[in-house]
Amino acid sequence: MNGKRPAEPGPARVGKKGKKEVMAEFSDAVTEETLKKQVAEAWSRRTPFSHEVIVMDMDPFLHCVIPNFIQSQDFLEGLQKELMNLDFHEKYNDLYKFQQSDDLKKRREPHISTLRKILFEDFRSWLSDISKIDLESTIDMSCAKYEFTDALLCHDDELEGRRIAFILYLVPPWDRSMGGTLDLYSIDEHFQPKQIVKSLIPSWNKLVFFEVSPVSFHQVSEVLSEEKSRLSISGWFHGPSLTRPPNYFEPPIPRSPHIPQDHEILYDWINPTYLDMDYQVQIQEEFEESSEILLKEFLKPEKFTKVCEALEHGHVEWSSRGPPNKRFYEKAEESKLPEILKECMKLFRSEALFLLLSNFTGLKLHFLAPSEEDEMNDKKEAETTDITEEGTSHSPPEPENNQMAISNNSQQSNEQTDPEPEENETKKESSVPMCQGELRHWKTGHYTLIHDHSKAEFALDLILYCGCEGWEPEYGGFTSYIAKGEDEELLTVNPESNSLALVYRDRETLKFVKHINHRSLEQKKTFPNRTGFWDFSFIYYE
């Protein structure tokens, strides 16, 4: 059973070169002159319009649905077969996970070629007439296949030249419980996406198209069916771009210097192994080599148990953090935290921890930590001693800054310097080490995204994980570091209970937390009362 209507044999002919050509048309009811004028008037006036062959709505932005786009079912079945025989490539980054075909612009398969002509000649002409937009002949289309846990998160599709987006669905019988809906977002006063206000369910031969604009935020929700594939052809009609509103910049998250707190707080909270000076030297050597380290069993067991109990059973007030084109997770209201969690937050802001992190990393996060200049003087003194005692030194010269950040520049020459060295040196000399942090709750559907205004700067990331027992990488929720402008992963940090992750990143490195998919619900089999996991997330600046 495939739920499709019985098909009449579609017309076919043999082309000049002996190749089979197939014929098809899009819904002639849509092209009927009276209806066409009504649709054009609704588009012009930005008013809703509903008819059995086409529906236009303005909420939350202009979009249209043609339930039965192609007239020949036989053609659609032939098209589906050709598409399923294409090579698909996995598309995977912070924003999406699905499979995509190569560009269909030059494919010669008969059904694909015919659909291309229908869309970018016949339908484009009709669309130009009703929208009064001078749409170009640019062909921009591909085939996408979404399977279990695949998704495309919130975005606006806006790119130079894109005017109208379209999706033609070729799916088996489908309902809302299977996911894969096209979700449309409302916007707030800053033209940022706010919440999903409409979800369009895929169905066989349904065409959806919408105007690409600064407010056309949408997503493909996660596919929840383990048996069925969500197959579609999508693309854009190009034309003159709309004027964008001024960019909105979120208020910066406040940073604060350390809280005066003596070293006793470390002895109360932290595994004594990590307070041993010799072990700290070992940690620093490893950190300076790779710019990242995972310190397991970081908190004392009794403290960590109390923290987890407070998170799991305590009265923590959570609020959702957005907007969804940048992030979606829950943040704790710090002023209302149970006392044990307040104390843990205080630990990560304490003067003693700033100094401990300096010892772990070699960064100057405390005035007692040695500066690069101090280290250079020590090295010069040591080299002088070597030359005096041995007559010569066979050690290779050390680079001026031995603290390498996580970066896509794995082999930097000694001549590479900061773009603004003098300004940065002044900042370093006059700046006070700062931090910002929050307690986060991660569960199914949560994520963070890299966006146009993601700030890339030198920083030390600290994450302490809680409630991650049984958590698998395939669930998502890991923190991924990538080179700016690239999809290549430089480092992945997987959630691990009572493990402290430290990562030093540079201006060419960005990070995101991968979308947590529905596989994560398997955690409930072992921990029925637990939903996701938690982390204490802090960023430190020299």
Curated annotation (Swiss-Prot):
Binding-site residues for Fe cation, renumbered to this chain: 155, 157, 218
Polar residues composition bias: residue spans: 400-416
Pfam family for this entry, one: 2OG-FeII_Oxy_4
Domain Fe2OG dioxygenase span(s) in chain numbering: 134-239
GO cellular component, one term: nucleoplasm
Enzymatic class: oxidoreductase
Coiled coil, from the record: none
Cofactor: Fe(2+); L-ascorbate
Location of the region described as Disordered in the Swiss-Prot/TrEMBL record: 373-435
An annotated Gene Ontology molecular function: peptidyl-proline 3-dioxygenase activity
Binding site for 2-oxoglutarate: 169, 230
Cofactor note text: Binds 1 Fe(2+) ion per subunit.
Keyword Cytoplasm found: yes
Enzyme Commission (EC) number: 1.14.11.-
UniProt xrefs under SMART domains: P4Hc
Key words, A-Z: Cytoplasm, Dioxygenase, Iron, Metal-binding, Nucleus, Oxidoreductase, Vitamin C
InterPro entries: Oxoglu/Fe-dep_dioxygenase_dom, Oxoglutarate/Fe-dep_Oase_C, Pro_4_hyd_alph, TPA1/OFD1_N, uS12_prolyl_hydroxylase
Motif (Nuclear localization signal): 4-20
Outcome of substituting residue 157 to A: Loss of function
Catalyses which reaction(s): [ribosomal protein uS12]-L-proline + 2-oxoglutarate + O2 = [ribosomal protein uS12]-(3S)-3-hydroxy-L-proline + succinate + CO2
Function field: Prolyl 3-hydroxylase that catalyzes 3-hydroxylation of 'Pro-62' of small ribosomal subunit uS12 (RPS23), thereby regulating protein translation termination efficiency. Involved in stress granule formation.
Family statement drawn from the similarity comment of this UniProt entry: Belongs to the TPA1 family.
Subunit annotation: Monomer.
Protein name listed in UniProt: Prolyl 3-hydroxylase OGFOD1
Gene name tied to this protein: OGFOD1
